Amino acid sequence: HKTIFRYDNPPLSAIQKLRLTPRNDINQKILNWDIDIKGCSIELDTFDYHDNRIHLCKTKDDINEIEITSYGRLKIKDTNGIAGEPTSNIPYELIKFMSSDYTKPGKKIKTLVSYFKNQFKKENLSDLEKLNLLSKKILNEVKYLKGKTSTKTSAEDSLSLGFGVCQDHVHIFLASARLLGFPSRYVSGYLMLNNTNIQEASHAWAEVYIENLGWVGFDISNGISP
């Protein structure tokens, strides 16, 4: 993973907080890992509250470019999108009550959730089946189209508009899933694309806590889930 920052004028001072080191857990093991930095020096190597490894680096004097490269090898277990039981110190039950301006449910979101509550009463569905139906419904209602929304667009607004991108799909999904009683969270990263190593933007998807499975991933924009 390589990131390059270029400046027209050298910054007087800049600090980067890097979270570029994978975690060792039940689904993956680090075989080797390193971070190369040009234009900065590492000032601190520590861990955050969630046990993610963090590097703080400070710019050197009179630089116009910073290049940060992280690389290594991992042994990964294929879990089909199921991350498993929580490793965070925050009780997962609390996440169903967490909200923000992006995921605050309005009239449109509440109408969507009411529709599903009525559907779920009629059918004997597992939680996984319910959430897959929700994901498909959102993608059908909100067509993927760039340029119609921004990083400031809320779930309610994008659902009303009928267009959006991955972050909009996730915000709608989170708002709806939480109203349905499911703890759920926003995940950002990269979508693996064939025949390309350079990506212009990051990707977003959701994870929902399902009893007896743990955290389960739902990529609403691409219709990918267990």
What are these regions (language model features)?
Residues I15, D168-P226:
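Hydrophobic/aromatic-rich core segments of domains that either
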Residues L74-I76, A83, E93-G164, I172:
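Secondary-structure boundary elements
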Residues H1-R6, D25-I26, D34-E43, S135, ...:
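A generic short-segment signal for beta-strand/edge and adjacent turn/coil regions
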Residues N27, L44, T151, L193-N194, ...:
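A broad, structure-centric signal for solvent-exposed, well-ordered loop/edge residues
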